[in-house]
Structure formats: C-alpha cells, structure tokens
C-alpha cells in the first residue's frame, strides 16, 4: 500500500469523500459546459438536444445511486465518473450511434483518479494497477479488431474500450472478461429482440456504447459481491 499508516476507518472515509467530491465536480462540469457537448451530436442527427437541467438532474440521481452502490470499492471516483457521464454518453450513442470523445476523455480522467485513490487506500494497489492495465488490453484488442471488419465496431467504441477495461480490470481480470462478454451478449439479445418485434432488420446496427458502459459498471460493482450471495 502506498500509504501504510492509514487506519481502516480513515480509508473508508477517504473513499466516501473522494466519491462525494467526484459527484460535486462532475455535476459542476456538466452544469457549466459539459452539457453542451451532446448538442452537436443530436443536431447533426436532426434530433432535439437534451436540456441542461435534464442532464444535470439525471446525472445527479445516477451519481447518488452509485455512491451508495460503490461505497465499498476503493476506486470510487472512477465508478462515479463512468456512471454519471457514461449514462449520458450511452444515451447519446443510443440515439445517434456516436460516442462523444469529450465524455470518453472525462471518464478516462475519472478512472485514473479512481486508480490513484485506490492505490492510496487499498493494500492491493499493485494488483489493482496491473489489473487495470491488463483489463484495458482485454477490452481494447478484440474491439479494435472488430473495428476493422465491415460493419464492425465504431471508432468511439474503440476509444471507450480501454477506459472501461481499466475500470473493471482493477477489480479483477475475471471481472474484466465477464463484463466484456456480458456487453456482447446483452447487445446480441437486444438486437435479436428488435428483430423479433419487427423494430429492426437483420442489417440494423446496434449501438454498443450503452451495453459496454452498463456491463462495465455491473462487473465493477457486482463482482466479488453477488457471487457471495449465491
């Protein structure tokens, strides 16, 4: 552990404090300028952009939920940032089939800060850092390869993949593999359902961003917790 003198209660407090500060910072950024980023993507897709109030309120609620859900995770800033900004980015992708680069960068910053906080308060900081690096590769390599195929993954998915892989990889390599598989399975089920109900054809592209972000958050929060309940 980088800081060996921290008692367990202080480690818990630092995790909660870092999560709360992340909640404040993300909301402040969205209120000041972050909310504007999505406007261009919706306008170019001839759709109505989201309002600032809708974005900030939604992000605040999502952040509050994940603040409670992720309080036992040492890398809370990463979880909070991906949850709050990722939810917005996922919605943009679902509507426009594009992932805003600025939101991906913001999530990457949050994941890095989460690794730093986790390194300070976790006795397994070396394993977490190595897991994040390998997790980023586990997610990046297959999605980058699929990007080269006709009709494959989009460029935004390739940029987002290592960010999410690092987040869930810091929990464990098995978690990273599980979350990646979950994202593809979920997207496949969603695509099949749309075909069955007649809302899409066999050549309709499914936006992967929402499934990647959702699967990464599920893997990060639930891995090592849910199996103990079963």
Please give the residue ranges for each predicted region.
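A membrane-topology feature that recognizes alpha-helical transmembrane segments
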Residues: 1-230
